[in-house]
Structure formats: structure tokens, C-alpha cells
Curated annotation (Swiss-Prot):
It comes from Buchnera aphidicola subsp. Baizongia pistaciae (strain Bp). Pfam families: Mur_ligase_C, Mur_ligase_M. This is Dihydrofolate synthase/folylpolyglutamate synthase. GO terms for biological process: folic acid biosynthetic process; one-carbon metabolic process; tetrahydrofolate biosynthetic process. Mg(2+) 1 binds at residues 82, 145. Belongs to the folylpolyglutamate synthase family. The lineage of its organism: Bacteria, Pseudomonadati, Pseudomonadota, Gammaproteobacteria, Enterobacterales. The keyword Ligase applies. Transmembrane segments: none annotated. InterPro entries: Folylpolyglutamate_synth, Folylpolyglutamate_synth_CS, Mur-like_cat_sf, Mur_ligase_C, Mur_ligase_C_dom_sf, Mur_ligase_cen. Functions in two distinct reactions of the de novo folate biosynthetic pathway. Catalyzes the addition of a glutamate residue to dihydropteroate (7,8-dihydropteroate or H2Pte) to form dihydrofolate (7,8-dihydrofolate monoglutamate or H2Pte-Glu). Also catalyzes successive additions of L-glutamate to tetrahydrofolate or 10-formyltetrahydrofolate or 5,10-methylenetetrahydrofolate, leading to folylpolyglutamate derivatives. Mg(2+) 2 binds at residue 172. GO terms for cellular component: cytoplasm. ATP binds at residues 58-61, 289, 302. Its EC number is 6.3.2.12, 6.3.2.17.
Amino acid sequence: MINKKLARSFSLYEWLYYLDHFMLDNIDPTLNRVFYVAKKLGVLKSKAFVFIVGGTNGKGSTCHVLENLLLNSGYRVGLYTSPHLMRYTERVRINGFELEHLYHISAFNDVKYFQNDVLLTRFEFITLSALILFKSYNLDIIILEVGLGGRLDATNILSADVSVITNIDIDHSKILGVNRSSISVEKSGIFRKNKIAIVADNNFPKVAQYLAKKKKVRLRIVNIDWIYKKIEFEWSFCSSKITWLHLPLPRNVSLDSVATALSAVSESGIKINQKVFRSCISEITLCGRFETISYNPIIILDVAHNPHSARYLFKKMSSFKKNGNIFAVVGILKEKNIKDIVSPLIPIVDYWYCITLLTHRSATSSEIIKYLPNHNSQISKNMTVALEKIFDKVTNNDIVLIFGSFITVCEANKFLANKVKNFKLL
């Protein structure tokens, strides 16, 4: 519970500044350090049922679908996701709600107290604080989103009852490897012996399958052990556990994420009601995932930040009936594959605005524009300048697309909330 005396030491913003500026990122890549502190904190053994979700894209969406479905089924649920979009407190939710600053401050103090001289990364520190918060509540279920990779991710210190991999694609190559096989080995490190592992990648590398079977993991692979199919305006799901037909399509999250979450829950043995599922999937919304915030003109925010998500974004954008121009604002982090993020969208974007994000991790606008056509691309100083230029010329028939990272969407949200008064925001 909250130690109010300690909690007054730093504000949440002071804590986050400390974590951003004084925590190390390059520490020996093992879980030994975080295991050691977690054991002292008493957070390794939980009575709650644990889902862990990894993959290149769709982790957050799948986690939020799981949360929504399980909450609506009457369970007490803790959710830990990253990164946050607008507020740090988005990262930890208890029964669907964010917690007040004081709870996070108290958890940070506890981690710091038991850390002593043990080195922790920022993400390891934050993950431990989330587990402390979960321990304070009598939860039925904990849902953890993997931060990066899986095998050596701090979330992997808990032994999950059901592990999920949404998909495998190239991202974070310097850490995870340069091909799907090596990446799949890292991501499947979240699998546990004799436990269920849901795989939503229909071309899951053979090496990861071999290692999983060697570990006696109970693999459940899409299109082999479970299938889902969209037919016009509905879809169906079938596995050895359930067959649900004529399901309504989700409105605001991808069908892939919904089907993956349903597979995970059905294999877990946790009881859910089909009627509840049907009603809740149409209500799920997730900020920054092909989020339409205006219709006059259409303004779309998407956190697509790697080649796989950029290709998916192109597919979604191509579904629009184009009556006007598409204006794109793009800001990308410097460690990303810029060329392969922007390339899929070049055929459909009419005007490009490249920005440098307000973070030291940002690629510069000059670095981004190198991969775009000369005739329709320009550099803007920042998000504000780019959007002001666009809004000077945009019409109600046009589309404004803002994408490239979570930070890009965050900066756009701040501008739109404070400055845009003449557009019909949803």
C-alpha cells in the first residue's frame, strides 16, 4: 500500500525525469538483476492468472482487447503496457482505470529502496513498480505487454500461464537480429514449459517452433490450431475449444488483434460468454491505432513505426475512397528503418511534411526527406509548423495522416487539442 511519507519525496514528474536521465540503458543483457530485486520485493509469485503478449506489432491492441473482454466478463484485471501515448499513468491500469500519481510514486520508492546498489534500466525499474501495484490488489488476471523482444525483457520475470506472439517482423535489428528466425527465437523466450503459447503469425519460423516443442510448450498456431475468417460484414472463429460464427466486426481495432485475444482466452480455460464478447468488441477503442479524430477533414493518427505496421497502414489507407489529396506528417525515431517505413505510403500520399520530433531520439527531418520524392516533400521545423501549413490549404475532401511513432501521435494530439477549433473533432 501507499507509504505516504516516502511518497512525498518526489513528484511523479521528478521521478520520471530521474528515470529518463539517470538510469542506464546499456547494462548486461540478463534478467539476473531484475530477478534479484523482484524477489526482494516479493512480486514474483502471483495468485493471478498471467497473460504475456509479445510480437512486432499489435501487442498493445491485443492486450487492450484482452482487458476489455475479461473485465466485461466480471474478472478483476491488471494491465501493464508500454509505451504510453499521452500520460505515464496509461501504462498501468487496475480494473480499467489509471491510478493516481501517489500510487506510482509509492511504488517507485519501494523499488528504489530494495534496489540498493543493483543496476536497473528504466524499463526494468518501471516494470517492477507495476508489479508492486498489481500486488496491492486482489487481481484475478494480469496482462503484461512485452517491451522489446521477449527472452530478456523485464516482463518475462513472471512465469506466464498463457504466452502470445502476435507476429514476427524486422524491428530493433541491433538487439533482436536481422532476420525473422533470429527475432522469433528472442520473442518466443516468453514461452513456458507445459504452458499454452498462442502464435498469430501464419509463417512462424521453424527454428522457433522446434525450440518450443523441445521445451514442451503447447503451441497453438493460427491457421493450424485455430482459424478466423472475415466474410463480408462478419467473421467467424474456430478452434478445438470453441466455434463462434457470424460475429460482428470490430470497429476501432484490428480483427487480427481481436481474434488473437479470443484464441488466448479460449485456450486459457477462463470462462467467457459469447454474448459479452459480441457486445464488447464493437466498443473497444485504442488511441493512435488508425484513429480517426475528425471527419471534416478526415484526420488520422497512427503510431506505425516499423515496416510491418507501415504496410498495414498502407492497406488501411487504400480502403478509403479518395476524393481529394492525402497530406502526411511523418516523424520517426532515429534508430528505425526510415526508408522501409515511408516507402509503402509513397504511392498514395500527395504531400509529405517531414518533422524532427521533440526528443533526442528523433531522426531529423533532413534524414527522413532523403527517402521521399523531391516534387512533393518538404521539411517543417516541428509538428506545429507542419500542421499549420496543412490547415492553411486542406479542404473537407482531403485526408491528413500523421504517423511514424508514439511520440509523433502524442505531439499531434497536443497541437490538435490546444489549437484546432474550427475542425469537427470526434
